[in-house]
């Protein structure tokens, strides 16, 4: 049975109550306050819904993740990285990255990154929890991604690319940096060919929950300004 969240409570139902069809739908309602979003990620769920729908909260089983040590850099991507045709930065323009991620896609109608969603994640960025990766080419933003860093876990949200390999360069650079900072897992939420080509794989939700339990409150050496 689907749980309806109340605005005066930040609690979420146990993950095992999530529906099998559609896979992982856990709850509906609530709001996108910073406090609720932080609680959601710590609990193991995330918001995803289309404009005009109520807020839907998901915790799919299995969960797609990438372990930094398992990053797969193909020969062609390695060549692009060596050529240094792109420049990568962190937290230089979060607003521009999330705006670009909300842009139209050839394979989808509409966007789930609504103005309300953008405002919510920008608040998390102001609090030092949400971070962006920017990929530049000749001074123009051509790719990037954003997500949340909590403890030793990074929760990826969305990425975009306006040039061949731009998002892959940004993601690979982020993963290398996260591994250096002591992060143990990147939450990719749902499988895509793009992420799987970079080394992402699916694990049981119970295993994902174990990582939440053991690593959310451990420190990292992250320095997003460096």
Swiss-Prot record:
GO terms for cellular component: cytoplasm. It is found in: Cytoplasm. The keyword Transferase applies. It comes from the Bacteria. One of its GO terms (molecular function) is leucyl-tRNA--protein transferase activity. Keywords: Acyltransferase, Cytoplasm, Transferase. This is Leucyl/phenylalanyl-tRNA--protein transferase. One of its GO terms (biological process) is protein catabolic process. The lineage of its organism: Bacteria, Pseudomonadati, Pseudomonadota, Gammaproteobacteria, Pseudomonadales. Belongs to the L/F-transferase family. Pfam families: Leu_Phe_trans. It comes from Azotobacter vinelandii (strain DJ / ATCC BAA-1303). The keyword Nucleotide-binding does not apply. It catalyses: N-terminal L-lysyl-[protein] + L-leucyl-tRNA(Leu) = N-terminal L-leucyl-L-lysyl-[protein] + tRNA(Leu) + H(+); N-terminal L-arginyl-[protein] + L-leucyl-tRNA(Leu) = N-terminal L-leucyl-L-arginyl-[protein] + tRNA(Leu) + H(+); L-phenylalanyl-tRNA(Phe) + an N-terminal L-alpha-aminoacyl-[protein] = an N-terminal L-phenylalanyl-L-alpha-aminoacyl-[protein] + tRNA(Phe). Its EC number is 2.3.2.6. Functions in the N-end rule pathway of protein degradation where it conjugates Leu, Phe and, less efficiently, Met from aminoacyl-tRNAs to the N-termini of proteins containing an N-terminal arginine or lysine.
């Amino acid at each position: 049975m689907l749980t309806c969240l109340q605005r005066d409570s930040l609690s979420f139902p146990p993950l095992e109550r999530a529906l099998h069809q559609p896979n992982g739908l856990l709850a509906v309602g609530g709001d996108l306050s910073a406090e609720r979003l932080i609680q959601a990620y710590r609990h193991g769920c995330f918001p995803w819904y289309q404009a005009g729908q109520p807020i839907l909260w998901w915790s799919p089983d299995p969960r797609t993740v990438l372990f930094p040590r398992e990053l797969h850099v193909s020969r062609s991507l390695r060549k692009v990285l060596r050529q240094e045709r792109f420049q990568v930065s962190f937290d230089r323009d979060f607003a521009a990255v999330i705006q670009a991620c909300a842009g139209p896609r050839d394979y989808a109608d509409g966007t789930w990154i609504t103005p309300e969603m953008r405002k919510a994640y920008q608040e998390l960025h102001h609090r030092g929890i949400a971070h962006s990766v920017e990929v530049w080419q000749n001074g123009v933003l051509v790719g990037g991604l954003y997500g949340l860093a909590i403890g030793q876990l990074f929760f990826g949200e969305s990425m975009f690319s306006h040039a061949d390999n731009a998002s892959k360069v940004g993601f690979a650079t982020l993963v290398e940096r996260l591994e250096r900072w002591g992060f143990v897992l990147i939450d990719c939420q749902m499988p895509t060919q793009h992420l799987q080509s970079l080394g992402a794989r699916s694990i049981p939700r119970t295993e994902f929950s174990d990582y939440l339990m053991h690593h959310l409150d451990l420190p990292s050496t992250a320095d997003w300004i460096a």
